[in-house]
């Protein structure tokens, strides 16, 4: 923590450029201006002085590259942090209340005197704040009120996991303010996941939080979720001649919690037939050997979703290896296979019984046309709505973006890069 004016001058003078580069910024001048804007917003919102002790912190959104809905079954995933983030200025306020001012939104206030789950707070930012800080408190660290001014380029419903980025932001900040930075990135991810499951009320695996908290590209094996194996991958997409595009399909996934919840529920129902809790504990050959009975007990969709798990779990490991050895053809083929499996087996492209509106299916069909046999595309993240992902030859990216935005909507196609750092105190 340093005085507001000292940090402000450090940003303006370029003394924090090395930290800003870790956020994946492509324009240092713009990054400095954004950081000073956040500091000015903090000062104006909370009446801070130039001597107020502050810190700048950042947490990125994430992109899932392979392993669609495998994490909650203790499977393997390939994911990466991206250069869209939450950037915040924070200061202790001497009270028990957290004041969270997200730019352009009403203030969120959370009194830490009560750290119990609040039903009325579920699916709100307040629940994430209370949940993360409750976990730090239960770990034996005294938590206290702080003021935080936040700007975000990770929009809710964007498929880049804004909730996980918010959890990592609060976790990284709390770890710095109250825990002397004793928690590592994976531990912060676990805290965020617990907050989302228990306080926010949304079942989720650990992929989103781990990718955001650790940074760069990561291959994660959740066989032991209390101790996931995290392997950093040098995902040099530019070296492969590829650009990462995230396309907003035009439908909001914020109200689809039941659709998302049905996937882990049905996969776990298949596992339960074999006396297990998750599919990672069940051999695929055992499922195939008893397929008729499992279909009767769990239903056909559950069986198809289980078959997707086994295939995408293998693909996640193969795709990480392909990226590491810079095998472009193998990588793109695996992306295509993953996309087909999500559509045909996992069935998370269109909400159940949706006929008139199938936004994600249309977006995928348009992307296939725009790619014209080159590159690859797939559903991105939870599915049903939100975004799709495309890996596009760099020489075609401008034309691809133009085609997608002409056929879908202006501004729907975002060209991103992989961010080197995860949750970060600048």
Label the model's feature ranges.
Residues 133-156:
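Glycine- and acidic-rich phosphate- and metal-coordinating loops
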Residues 1-62, 87, 91-122, 219-378, ...:
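C-terminal nucleotide
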